[in-house]
Amino acid sequence: MTVEQFYEFCLVNRDLRIERTASGEVIIMSPAFSDTGNRNGKIAVQLGNWAEQDDTGEAFDSSAGFTLPNGAIRSPDVSWIKLERWNALTEEQKASFAPICPDFVIELRSSSDTLKGLQKKMQEYIDNGVSLGLLIDRTNRKVYIYRPDREPEILDNPETVSADPELPGFVLRMAKIW
């Protein structure tokens, strides 16, 4: 499916969670289960509050789709983009699946997600320009930290996860996410 066809498909199916792979394959996902949506909200609030105070970037929830350099259109559970990069986009670009890869992404594994599938998605984000990615695996109480040119760092049952130095001062509190 082309980008234009994908956009039209999304407009007609606003109630679906849809992504597009780099090869044009359309992935239709079920809505998040209530508990996952609640935890995604808690993560988005923490990042959003930090972003408002820090004022160096814009935070996004899972409803935002981005066109990555490889052509995939992805919607991370939570993401953040440096203000100068976001402001470099035209208003028309911002009002679509913006052609930009976030600087920071978080994916929260739900019971319908496979760990392997999310790990592949996190690597795709890194390969397309993400500076820092967090994969939160509630089932096993692990956080996988992704950075370019490194193997993922794995934290076992952390109370907090620091996003330094990429997002100075942002610390994700895990108590209400587990």
Tell me the role of every PLM-derived stretch.
Residues 1-178:
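Gly/Pro/Ser/Thr-rich low-complexity, intrinsically disordered segments predominantly at protein N-termini
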